[in-house]
Amino acid sequence: MPSMAQGELKSFVQNSRPNPKSPTVSPFSMRQKIAEHRRSLPIASVEKRLVEEVQKNDILIIVGETGSGKTTQLPQFLYNAGFCREGKMIGITQPRRIAAVTVAKRVAEECEVQLGQKVGYSIRFDDTTSGSTRLKYMTDGLLLREALLDPHLSRYSVIIVDEAHDRSVHTDVLLALLKKIQRTRSQPVSEKTEFGNVASQVQTTTRDANGPQQNGVLKGYQGRKLSPLKLIIMSASLDARVFSEYFGGAKAVHVQGRQFPVDILYTVHPESDYVDATLVTIFQIHFEEKPGDILVFLTGQDEIESVERLVQERLQNIPEDKRKLLPLAIFSALPSEQQMKVFAPAPTGFRKVILATNIAETSITIPGIRYVIDPGFVKARSYDPSKGMESLDVVPASKAQTLQRSGRAGREGPGKSFRLYPEREFEKLEDSTKPEIKRCNLSNIILQLKALGIDDIVGFDFIDKPSRGAIIKALAELHSLGALADDGKLENPVGYQMSRLPLEPVYSKALILANQFNCLEEMLITVAVLSVESIFYDPREKREEARTSKNHFASVEGDHLTYLSVYRESDEFLEKRKAAGSGNNIDKIMKKWCKENYVNSRSLKHARDIYRQIREHVEQIGFNVSSCGNDMLAFRRCLAASFFLKAAQRQLDGTYRALESGEVVHIHPTSVLFRAKPECVIFNELMQTSKKYIKNLTIIDSLWLSELAPHHFQTAE
């Protein structure tokens, strides 16, 4: 077992009693329990003061520790205070989809309403709101897209930007946009807004996509003043200065959280394998510590599933009376019904061990946690604009993140945090996480700003300005894709069409081109599959069987055509079963088919949902969904025309050179083309591990590049 040494004791004052777990109770008792829980939250004692502060201040910053109740209770306080009169809504944004969904479900339960009525959520490819929704939880990116259709966000009286400390790229841009919207909401509405000629630029639900249309949302407000917009910024970080300064000295109020003392323990020496050290520490706690659930922070789905499997295996090798340990996972790609399991009490006598990504730092509160295991790492996005290379890397967490993690052990009673690194390593960590806007590809966000009529991107009022190089690279990429004209404004109609689709710009352009190549059906399927976790299931204990099954679907021409084969074959299977009268058990039958074919049923189901949603979007634009049937040459040419910025050519030594960046890259072992070594390919993902790998490949003819993207390639002499 890792050797643990007692480090500095971090003590926090707690002013509320913990909430004990309860067995299953009657509906009346459940309502009573919920009411008692709400009254016990730290924020309940300051309800009146908070409502008064919102009434007095158009901008308010609320700093409250995770578990204080700010996310679930403040919107209800404001609703009860009359902020939703005349049909207005309170919008609450989250940087993560899972938080928007779980919190909305909890608030609907507290309000005793069906989800989608008074309380609803809206995330990409999933909307439960209705005309009666007044408390709307959503991702920050979703609200940004909503601003394209309603530049004044006229339906909202209050916008609450939650988890602002997360500093996601969408949160940062949204705050800048809301700063402008607040000013324009105090002026009479006209077609000319501070964002430019937005009302006439953005198309609404018309099927005529050949030019900009008048925005119908604002027609009823022409020449009138809208009511002021209240903006509340909520953060779990005690340092709110960056937000206060950005909003001209906005007032900040603090809500005390529930916090018991947490003992911080460090390893004596660095751990060479933190996954193994995590596993050992889980069982050390289980055998030696008092009752209480364990929360483990891991970097992603692969690590979580690996540790979950290893815990299950080791449980089989210990005495039966010691096996009462229940491993549960929570990460964004997990279906919501499985995510909900972490919030339920463990069976009597069992200890839960929750395996989570950094979503559990602040976005959600899991009851029952007394022990935290923190290996000290997080998966973070990075971007090199000079090479156009974006990667997801495992990096050390920041001090702010590790403090948030430790705090999770002290919500309901004294706890312990096991940091799997020496104390001296903690002192070397960065104070806070670098804002995402400084380490990501900006093409998608710039496309949305352009659609809002904001053309001066360099001069835009970002909280933290991205590098000039990153902005220039994104503008060049959008110009190459045909989204921007030579003057830097949105190209008509392509730029407007691309901004309407809730996808990365390169995927939006792929769908537009597929309409011209008469293979829109095939591209819709491909984009849907590329938008989910791996569609293939590859269990370690049955790797050979999984490989054989994958070969059944594999196309010699590449991964995209292989994905198409899986999707089509599953479609054919479904149609046959429906024709045979098996419609009632279709989900169960589909899961069985997926298991037999080593296909990830969750990913396939998600891809189907995304396909349906994107299809609706392209039909609204005015496209007819045509199919090229078995003409894969047309489809591959469309792939080349769409993804020409990610083309790679084989070199004499067998490696590949990415044509756009000049980087030496290798075909990833999971590709069906791994051993084929084709001359030229397009790819969708470049990732850095031990080597620079390209994933999701299809073979193309190199001559197609200069033919289909002549503005970007010149034929070699």
UniProtKB/Swiss-Prot annotation:
The keyword Nucleus applies. A motif (DEAH box) lies at residues 162-165. SMART domains: AAA, DEXDc, HA2, HELICc. It is an enzyme of class 3 (hydrolase). Disruption phenotype: Defects in female gametophyte development. Residues 51-256 form the Helicase ATP-binding domain. The keyword Nucleus applies. Residues 278-453 form the Helicase C-terminal domain. Widely expressed but spatially and temporally regulated during development. InterPro entries: AAA+_ATPase (IPR003593), DEAD-box_helicase_OB_fold (IPR011709), DEAD/DEAH_box_helicase_dom (IPR011545), HA2_WH (IPR048333), Helicase-assoc_dom (IPR007502), Helicase_ATP-bd (IPR014001), Helicase_C-like (IPR001650), P-loop_NTPase (IPR027417). This is Pre-mRNA-splicing factor ATP-dependent RNA helicase DEAH10. It comes from Arabidopsis thaliana (Mouse-ear cress).
